[in-house]
């Protein structure tokens, strides 16, 4: 997570939570003049389009007042979806036993992309079962992580 993404998470989390939703995480994607702030929200009873619209209004109001992003951007608010992104250690703990794709910031054993089942979470260390072996990753070295849906 970048410094800006951490700042935005701190800025938005209380407001989103006060509205009855969980701020799962967010991504800020810089793409020249077409930057996007993608915010993932959830609710204990699931989330629908109306919930996303309500959360979007709440987030927009905070962003308009605080104005933490200096470039033009589009706001997208959505559910985490089937390929749910994992941002926090608690997310990994919630999905122990599930298969995930990881992309690392810095390669480990000459690999940046990993796929395996979450077997343990200890503090900021995430352990996956990869090809029969346990591999442990520091949360701070994980650039992106998504659940792999089972059909």
From Swiss-Prot:
Pfam families noted in UniProt: DUF150_C (PF17384), RimP_N (PF02576)
Claim: Cytoplasm is one of the keywords in the record: yes
Major localization class: cytoplasm
InterPro entries, per database record: Ribosome_maturation_RimP, RimP_C, RimP_C_sf, RimP_N, RimP_N_sf
UniProt-listed GO biological process terms: ribosomal small subunit assembly; translation
Subcellular location: Cytoplasm
Taxonomy, superkingdom: Bacteria
HAMAP family to which the protein is assigned, alphabetical: RimP (MF_01077)
Task of the protein: Required for maturation of 30S ribosomal subunits.
Name by which UniProt lists this protein: Ribosome maturation factor RimP
Species of origin: Photobacterium profundum (strain SS9)
Recorded name of the encoding gene: rimP
